[in-house]
Amino acid sequence: MKNLFVLLTTGMMVSASFAQSSDSSTYYYNRGLDEKNARRYREAEKNFNKSFQLDPQNLDNLLQLASTLMEQHRYAEAREKYHKAEVIDPNNKLVVENLATLSFNMRKWEDVIRYVQKMQQLKIGKGADFLMARSYYELENYGEAIKYCELAVKEDAKNAQIYYIAGRSFMDMHNYKRAAGCFDQALALDSTNSTWMYEAGLVWYAVPNDQKALYWIEKAGEKGYKKSNDYMENLASAYLNAGKFDKGISVLQEILKKKPQDQELLYSIGEAYYKTKKYPEAIEYWDQVLILDNKNANALYMMGMAFQKKGDTQRGVMLCDKAIEMDPSLKKLREERKMPGGL
């Protein structure tokens, strides 16, 4: 009888304690809602946390806590809370959709795919195919990326990023013509993205279409793309390839001020002058290459060609012969009357 009394008493105490805990959890939950509605998110978070400590299985409280963390841009912590909510209710639509979005923003690409597939099963949310396309692209699965781009464009044909992802996927598979078409479609929808413009220029260069390559590389610079040495060198190449030699040479000379002993730059300027039949200038720049590297057979050979073009045949032939001694493969160029590089 005494044991029964102890059990009953203990049971009543546990029940009372549970009820008190539940009441306290509800109290802090309601206070959290009030603070959140007043946009005092830090105070709301404190109350939702107290409620969570008292009742970890309260799904509504967990969702409010996660939402409050998101309002404070604390996405990793919010994602952790949504994961706890997922354990309680794996098919909760709000939980699944937010986990997909947070995983996307945090570049957790495999998780994005998993949650988007769940979104599709639950038939919720929008833009699922775009999220899949981007995730597969980042995972370097370009075939799947393009497949989902084709699906995504049916849902939102005005989303420029869809065409950009498709373009990058084709580019990374070296299908430059398809890539170029996608870049053009992306830029038709977003005419402000200088990075896309620059990449479009590089893709058109690879096609090759020299005029379109120059157009987009120039446009990128006009729209604010950083004019790094790499950008300027590609701009110079685009000018030269498009036959605008004066502009190309001018850009190369500007770069040379920053990289005064760059042999490739010096060689390229000499090559550009040679193509415009300015042979003394070409000789001057190839001579600078040889000062830096007297074993550069290509520069020596081209000096010889330039001397021949300007009428000093004997000296030119002598230099070409010396270059061929240094690099016998140049003999074939003489026979074909080509420049090094097949030009």
PLM segments and residue spans:
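Structural marker of alpha-solenoid helical repeat scaffolds
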Residues: 54, 88, 121-123, 155, ...
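N-terminal leader/linker segments that initiate helical-solenoid repeat arrays
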Residues: 2, 17-76, 80, 87, ...
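Terminal, low-structured helical/coil segments at or just beyond the last alpha-helical repeat
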Residues: 24-26, 241-243, 301, 305-343
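Canonical tetratricopeptide repeat
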Residues: 30, 64-67, 71, 98-101, ...
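TPR alpha-solenoid repeat register
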Residues: 27, 61, 95, 128-129, ...
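Register position in tetratricopeptide repeats
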Residues: 37-38, 71-72, 105-106, 138-139, ...
